[in-house]
Amino acid sequence: MFKTLTQNLMKIFDRLVSSGLLTEEQIDAALRDIRVALLESDVALPVIKNFVAEVKQKALGQEVIKSVSPGQMIIKIIHEEMINILSSSEDEIKLNLNAKPPVNLLMVGLQGSGKTTASGKLALCLKNQNKKVLLVSLDTYRPAAQEQLEILANSVKINSLPIVKGEKPLDIVKRAMAEAKLSAYDIVIYDTAGRTQIDQEMMNEAIAIKKIVEPTETLLVIDSMTGQDAVVTASSFNEQLEISGLILSRIDGDSKGGAALSVKYITQRPIKFLSSGEKLTDLEEFDAKRIASRILDMGDIISFVEKAASIVDREQAEKTAAKLKKGKFDLNDYLQQMKSIKKIGGFGSILSMLPGSGKIMDQIDQSKLNSKIIEHQEAIILSMTPKERRNPDIINASRRKRIALGAGTTVQKVNILLKQFKQISDMMKKASNMNPKNLLRSGLGKLFS
């Protein structure tokens, strides 16, 4: 999501750090470059003006002039100001569920923003907190919209209100409220009709629904790929519906990232969640410090560890670690690692959370980060015999031909896999004695080049 902005900022930071003592003129030049980088990333102009002014005021302070490394100090100030723009209090970010059950949550947004999928993701998140959740679709306008929510609910074993054809949205609300009380639901999530544009008639319907439902949260789902249009959308919904928070969707897309920096500042409403991908597990609580670190290429190791911990089999990981200590790492272990990487979100997702990754992303063949590559490699390894997986060195030309035939691929692809396995195996042996940033550059950079 922040790739372009991150890479542009990294070039500016490299110049700052390479300079010794910085003059006011150099600081002004750097801030002009930062302004351009933010504009190119679709950050709203009021946000840019405030951000640059705050950074300049602090950068020209005595604490910077006396600093041993003024370039690093300015980067620190930029990091802090980015956190200030994005952050809200802990109470604001946390979902407000403080009401007598059933607690009502209202989801609003433009059509195509990912609102229905976000509703399903939020429902699963709450279900995992041992809440009894009911999903209710109020979208009687878009073909199959109600069925879409029903399918999502069924896929994760969450109840959805049965569909009654021809029923009006306000009547659906009344039926849902009665069902929620009768069946003792903890939380009801209402997925309102998406609007193709900010339409007053549809907005009035949402206002009427909110008046009846009295939700503890009115959450606006914003497509992060819409750029500066996101600010217009957020402002309009906030003015008329008094939203309580934001969910940014499609953060894994090829967007410029400006929406994240703009919508919170303009609406003064907290970003509560980030949504990526189509999997209902792809929802993360928003953390300003972590996102600011990602933007400035400082990595987000905490999110990476949390995601890995929720997915990776601890017992299997301990077995692999024990084998590595003995200098043993075979294709069975490699296969397990590939499966874990796929669950976490693939190589691209992992790289985006590692410090310094922004500088090597341009050097990496992006097509090789595709999850399909992992699936192809799984097929190749599964076409090997148990003996071959334990002892890759015995895989000669004739064996490679047989493996390729069994996997429905070419000998060249088998050769590539074995080469990558060798590189990773060597990396594993060096990892304990190498700085993580150096490992990233020397290892992963070569692996995907």
Swiss-Prot record:
A Gene Ontology biological process term: SRP-dependent cotranslational protein targeting to membrane
NCBIfam families with a match to the protein in the record: ffh (TIGR00959)
Annotated Gene3D superfamilies: P-loop containing nucleotide triphosphate hydrolases (3.40.50.300), Signal recognition particle SRP54, nucleotide-binding domain (1.20.120.140), Signal recognition particle, SRP54 subunit, M-domain (1.10.260.30)
Domain observations: Composed of three domains: the N-terminal N domain, which is responsible for interactions with the ribosome, the central G domain, which binds GTP, and the C-terminal M domain, which binds the RNA and the signal sequence of the RNC.
Residues noted as binding GTP in the record, renumbered to the chain: 109-116, 191-195, 249-252
Catalysed conversion reaction: GTP + H2O = GDP + phosphate + H(+)
Name of the top EC class for this enzyme: hydrolase
GO CC, alphabetical: signal recognition particle
The protein, known as: Signal recognition particle protein
PANTHER family: SIGNAL RECOGNITION PARTICLE 54K PROTEIN SRP54, SIGNAL RECOGNITION PARTICLE SUBUNIT SRP54
Subunit-level organization: Part of the signal recognition particle protein translocation system, which is composed of SRP and FtsY. SRP is a ribonucleoprotein composed of Ffh and a 4.5S RNA molecule.
EC number: 3.6.5.4
Pfam families assigned to the protein according to its UniProt record, in alphabetical order: SRP54, SRP54_N, SRP_SPB
Domain of life where this protein originates: Bacteria
Protein location: Cytoplasm
PROSITE patterns named among the record's database cross-references: SRP54
Gene Ontology molecular functions: 7S RNA binding; ATP hydrolysis activity; GTP binding; GTPase activity
